Amino acid sequence: MALYAIGDTHLSLSSNKPMDVFGGGWEGYVDKLQKGFAAVGPEDTVVLCGDLSWGMSLEEAKKDFAFLDALPGARKLLLKGNHDYWWNTAAKMNRFFAESGFSTLRILHNNCYEYGGYALCGTRGWFYEEERGGHSAKIFNRELIRLEASLKAAGEREKYCFLHYPPLYQGYRCQEILDLLHRYGVTRCFYGHLHGGSHRLAAVGEQDGIQFRLVSADYLRFQPEKICD
């Protein structure tokens, strides 16, 4: 068994928003994803760090979920990204996956999963692009509550945290999220969201005792990052 992570697959098999139009590394990205997942074994776990489908509803994203479900891996843990407009309550999503026969898809939201003694925790997170104030402050506070709920669910196990948004970026620090990571003893943090020229500005490596890693699909050349066996 092995644990992998990748984010920002931006699938659009049912909607007209293919990422190929951006050129560069995104050309033929669906085929690249399929080839990249060849490294994943049938018993492996893959954490998908948000921005998975351009579908506006669960039904519209169904072909994208079918694609993800058919890829190698026993479990794919789905995290919410800022473009996952199909996202719904956990109960509705789990019911939809069950009724659709998507047996490998799981929701990582207010909970955690175990992998080989590690606790896999996470939430969407927060980024400086989203201004705070009024409604945004409520959303930000909910994200903190969700992350803490996930970390608490892990108990005393060593914790790996998966976010969509980077908690660090150039001079930006989401201090409230970083404080939670330190308080609960998170040792490794994986995130997506950044594309293109933003890759070179990403926080990668150890900072303040936590190992940070960018796992956006285009950064990884569409091959999931192996975290551990």
Spans of model-derived segments:
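Short, solvent-exposed loop/turn segments at secondary-structure junctions
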Residues: 56, 168-171, 198
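Short, charged, surface-exposed secondary-structure boundary motifs
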Residues: 87, 117, 189, 221-226
